[in-house]
């Protein structure tokens, strides 16, 4: 069904940030592995996260919803995970599927995995290759794409692994396999990626070490045989989801948007750093901590943005925010260049191609490159008037709908159903701010 976002004069209001998707996945996984019971509040109840919970239940954990965003998890502890009776369907969840591949590698179990058409087109060899070195067996073909069957090993071997591409999911899968491996597992990163796995594992009682190797390589080390213990935690607000609301405030001529309880983590701050470089009017107030993460309230109001060359050192810390950054670039004055972002080619869609198509159909001049794109900003309101093919990508859909609130003409999208994978409250939150989005 087509949905259309109509231009509005003002977006204003206060919104509590939805629970962070990355932390929500990890909470259910680590709680399911731990000894005893864990209790979580503020958990994101998007389809991706719920499928992770279902997978943990299928392998022996008890996962119970006790209220909106509140979940209790009783872990399997020392007895470990068991083979699920049916196929584990991860839907669109790359995070859940990849992290659980690492978990399954260290248990005496066999599991068949699948997903939707988008997930089954995404590369999994980048995760499978190091796990195979550790002892995982699988039935994946040469392209490493789902569906396939995994068989774990009780005698997993620790390795030192340097991922060829910066990827928090690959790092996390290897570290999670390392929990049950013989010896010390080390992941060596040339570029630091989001560190929620390391932070949350420590919260569950695991011991990790961090060191700097020659050449500025970051090493994360974990000794096998460690047991996790249950944890009570509040899930911090998702900075990637908050970015859509913050961008809406920046583009609204009378914008006055406050997003509360947003996680402030240097491995996730790239979008906000780049927005600041573009001249964004942002304010931040301390709010405390949740699950070992600093929380802030972020305020945004209208700002005349300018184009920049996005520093490549920030790419990994904003890999999910490039679609909404492209929208800001379209409204900015001057040229915005994105380079070093080839990882976008293998997200829920080919996000480089999807971003370029989204802008072009709405009258924005943009050039596609192999590792990014270059946007010629309109210096104000973009023409709009286009129908965006979302390619079943939730972040393309949300970005286009934000664009429509400040464009000259309404902007339409071909589908919004996939938004539920990461931000089920997006439509209601936008309506609270004053957006006019209709089917």
UniProtKB/Swiss-Prot annotation:
<feature type="binding site">
    <location>
        <position position="94"/>
    </location>
    <ligand>
        <name>phosphoenolpyruvate</name>
    </ligand>
</feature>
<feature type="binding site">
    <location>
        <position position="320"/>
    </location>
    <ligand>
        <name>3-phosphoshikimate</name>
    </ligand>
</feature>
<feature type="binding site">
    <location>
        <position position="167"/>
    </location>
    <ligand>
        <name>3-phosphoshikimate</name>
    </ligand>
</feature>
<dbReference type="GO" id="GO:0008652">
    <property type="term" value="P:amino acid biosynthetic process"/>
</dbReference>
<dbReference type="InterPro" id="IPR001986">
    <property type="entry name" value="Enolpyruvate_Tfrase_dom"/>
</dbReference>
<feature type="binding site">
    <location>
        <position position="169"/>
    </location>
    <ligand>
        <name>3-phosphoshikimate</name>
    </ligand>
</feature>
<keyword id="KW-0808">Transferase</keyword>
<feature type="binding site">
    <location>
        <position position="169"/>
    </location>
    <ligand>
        <name>phosphoenolpyruvate</name>
    </ligand>
</feature>
<dbReference type="InterPro" id="IPR036968">
    <property type="entry name" value="Enolpyruvate_Tfrase_sf"/>
</dbReference>
<comment type="pathway">
    <text>Metabolic intermediate biosynthesis; chorismate biosynthesis; chorismate from D-erythrose 4-phosphate and phosphoenolpyruvate: step 6/7.</text>
</comment>
<dbReference type="Pfam" id="PF00275">
    <property type="entry name" value="EPSP_synthase"/>
</dbReference>
<dbReference type="InterPro" id="IPR013792">
    <property type="entry name" value="RNA3'P_cycl/enolpyr_Trfase_a/b"/>
</dbReference>
<comment type="function">
    <text>Catalyzes the transfer of the enolpyruvyl moiety of phosphoenolpyruvate (PEP) to the 5-hydroxyl of shikimate-3-phosphate (S3P) to produce enolpyruvyl shikimate-3-phosphate and inorganic phosphate.</text>
</comment>
<comment type="subunit">
    <text>Monomer.</text>
</comment>
<keyword id="KW-0963">Cytoplasm</keyword>
<feature type="binding site">
    <location>
        <position position="351"/>
    </location>
    <ligand>
        <name>phosphoenolpyruvate</name>
    </ligand>
</feature>
<feature type="binding site">
    <location>
        <position position="21"/>
    </location>
    <ligand>
        <name>3-phosphoshikimate</name>
    </ligand>
</feature>
<dbReference type="InterPro" id="IPR023193">
    <property type="entry name" value="EPSP_synthase_CS"/>
</dbReference>
<dbReference type="GO" id="GO:0009423">
    <property type="term" value="P:chorismate biosynthetic process"/>
</dbReference>
<dbReference type="GO" id="GO:0005737">
    <property type="term" value="C:cytoplasm"/>
</dbReference>
<feature type="active site" description="Proton acceptor">
    <location>
        <position position="320"/>
    </location>
</feature>
<dbReference type="GO" id="GO:0003866">
    <property type="term" value="F:3-phosphoshikimate 1-carboxyvinyltransferase activity"/>
</dbReference>
<keyword id="KW-0028">Amino-acid biosynthesis</keyword>
<keyword id="KW-0057">Aromatic amino acid biosynthesis</keyword>
<feature type="binding site">
    <location>
        <position position="347"/>
    </location>
    <ligand>
        <name>3-phosphoshikimate</name>
    </ligand>
</feature>
<comment type="similarity">
    <text>Belongs to the EPSP synthase family.</text>
</comment>
<dbReference type="GO" id="GO:0009073">
    <property type="term" value="P:aromatic amino acid family biosynthetic process"/>
</dbReference>
<feature type="binding site">
    <location>
        <position position="122"/>
    </location>
    <ligand>
        <name>phosphoenolpyruvate</name>
    </ligand>
</feature>
<feature type="binding site">
    <location>
        <position position="26"/>
    </location>
    <ligand>
        <name>3-phosphoshikimate</name>
    </ligand>
</feature>
<feature type="binding site">
    <location>
        <position position="21"/>
    </location>
    <ligand>
        <name>phosphoenolpyruvate</name>
    </ligand>
</feature>
<dbReference type="InterPro" id="IPR006264">
    <property type="entry name" value="EPSP_synthase"/>
</dbReference>
<feature type="binding site">
    <location>
        <position position="22"/>
    </location>
    <ligand>
        <name>3-phosphoshikimate</name>
    </ligand>
</feature>
<protein>
    <recommendedName>
        <fullName>3-phosphoshikimate 1-carboxyvinyltransferase</fullName>
        <ecNumber>2.5.1.19</ecNumber>
    </recommendedName>
</protein>
<feature type="binding site">
    <location>
        <position position="395"/>
    </location>
    <ligand>
        <name>phosphoenolpyruvate</name>
    </ligand>
</feature>
């Amino acid at each position: 069904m087509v949905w259309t976002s109509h231009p509005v004069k003002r977006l204003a209001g206060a919104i509590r940030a939805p629970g962070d998707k990355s932390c929500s996945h990890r909470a259910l996984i680590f709680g399911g592995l731990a000894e005893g019971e864990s209790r979580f509040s503020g958990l994101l109840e998007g389809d991706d996260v719920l499928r992770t919970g279902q997978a943990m239940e299928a392998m022996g954990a008890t996962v119970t919803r006790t209220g909106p965003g509140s979940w209790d998890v009783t872990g399997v502890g020392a007895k470990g995970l068991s083979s699920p009776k049916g196929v584990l369907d991860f839907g669109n969840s790359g995070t859940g599927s990849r992290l659980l591949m690492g978990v399954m590698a260290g248990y005496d179990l066999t599991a068949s995995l699948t997903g939707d058409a988008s997930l089954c087109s995404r590369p999994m060899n980048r995760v499978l290759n190091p796990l195979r070195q550790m002892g995982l067996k699988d039935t994946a073909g040469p392209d490493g794409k789902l569906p396939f069957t995994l068989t774990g090993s009780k005698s997993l071997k620790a390795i030192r692994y340097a991922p060829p591409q910066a990827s928090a999911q690959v790092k996390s899968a290897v570290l999670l396999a390392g929990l049950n491996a013989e010896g010390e597992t080390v992941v060596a990163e040339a570029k630091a990626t989001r560190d929620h796995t390391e932070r949350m594992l420590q919260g569950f009682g695991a011991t990790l070490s961090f060191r700097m190797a020659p050449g500025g390589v970051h090493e994360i080390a974990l000794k096998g045989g460690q047991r996790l213990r249950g944890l009570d935690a509040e899930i911090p607000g998702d900075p990637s989801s908050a970015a859509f609301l913050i961008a809406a405030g920046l583009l609204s001529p009378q914008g006055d948007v406050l997003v509360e309880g947003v996680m402030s983590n240097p491995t996730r701050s790239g979008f906000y750093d780049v927005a600041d470089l573009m001249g964004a009017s942002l304010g931040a107030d301390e709010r405390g901590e949740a699950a070992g993460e600093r929380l802030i309230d972020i305020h945004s109001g209208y700002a005349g943005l300018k184009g920049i060359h996005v520093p490549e050192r920030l790419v990994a810390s904003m890999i999910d925010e490039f679609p909404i950054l492209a929208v800001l670039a379209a409204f900015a004055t001057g040229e915005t260049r994105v380079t070093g972002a080839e990882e976008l080619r293998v997200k829920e869609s080919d996000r480089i191609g999807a971003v370029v198509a989204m802008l072009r159909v709405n009258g924005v001049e943009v050039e596609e490159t192999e590792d990014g794109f270059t946007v010629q900003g309109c210096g104000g309101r973009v023409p709009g008037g286009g129908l965006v093919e979302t390619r079943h990508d939730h972040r393309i859909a949300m970005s286009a709908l934000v664009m429509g609130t400040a464009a000259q003409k309404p902007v339409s999208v071909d589908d919004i159903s996939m938004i539920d994978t990461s931000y089920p409250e997006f439509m209601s939150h936008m309506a609270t701010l004053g957006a006019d989005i209709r089917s």
